[in-house]
């Protein structure tokens, strides 16, 4: 399992277009630019609690999107299969082994 920050960054990458502008800004500042809650609150002239609440709600939304759409899970699975393919090519695997890996890529939903 990815650590929380890395996971949120990935989820944000996949689903940011589904967020409001304010949610995108808060998440970007917090996770990508490493701003503190206080710095974000000062930037937007709101309370730290308002920023915290917004970020927590947005995190929950991102997790919900992932639960329904599984874009990150599919990306991770594709990456895993591609790594296996690279290793198979390096060790000069049989064409059957390579085809099996390619088919597993092809059948990913």
Swiss-Prot record:
Q: What does this protein do?
A: Might take part in the signal recognition particle (SRP) pathway. This is inferred from the conservation of its genetic proximity to ftsY/ffh. May be a regulatory protein.
Origin species: Halalkalibacterium halodurans (strain ATCC BAA-125 / DSM 18197 / FERM 7344 / JCM 9153 / C-125) (Bacillus halodurans)
Protein's UniProt name: UPF0122 protein BH2485
- State the family it belongs to: Belongs to the UPF0122 family.
Q: Which Pfam families match?
A: UPF0122 (PF04297)
Which InterPro entries does the entry mention? RNA_pol_sigma_r3/r4-like (IPR013324), UPF0122 (IPR007394), UPF0122_fam_protein (IPR054831), WH-like_DNA-bd_sf (IPR036388)
């Amino acid at each position: 399992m990815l650590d929380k920050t890395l996971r949120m960054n990935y989820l944000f990458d996949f689903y940011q277009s589904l967020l409001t502008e304010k949610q995108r800004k808060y998440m970007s500042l917090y996770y990508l630019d490493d701003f503190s809650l206080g710095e974000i609150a000062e930037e937007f002239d709101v309370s730290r609690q308002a920023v915290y609440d917004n970020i927590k709600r947005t995190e929950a939304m991102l997790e919900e999107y992932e639960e329904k759409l599984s874009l990150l899970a599919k990306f991770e699975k594709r990456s895993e299969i591609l790594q296996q393919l690279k290793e198979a090519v390096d060790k000069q695997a049989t064409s059957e082994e390579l085809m099996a890996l390619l088919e597993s890529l092809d059948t990913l939903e």
